[in-house]
Amino acid sequence: HADGIYTSDVASLTDYLKSKRFVESLSNYNKRQNDRRM
């Protein structure tokens, strides 16, 4: 059933993008903390 596969693909892609964005914002936050320390 193509629709089911497509939906799950979109869901996993969304999760992937969300986690990627989370990791990016986390590393940006860490960078800011390090800058403040210097």
Swiss-Prot record:
It comes from the Eukaryota. Disulfide bonds: none annotated. InterPro entries: Glucagon_GIP_secretin_VIP. One of its GO terms (cellular component) is extracellular region. The keyword NAD does not apply. The keyword Secreted applies. Keywords: Secreted. One of its GO terms (molecular function) is hormone activity. It is found in: Secreted. Belongs to the glucagon family. This is Glucagon-like peptide. It comes from Hydrolagus colliei.
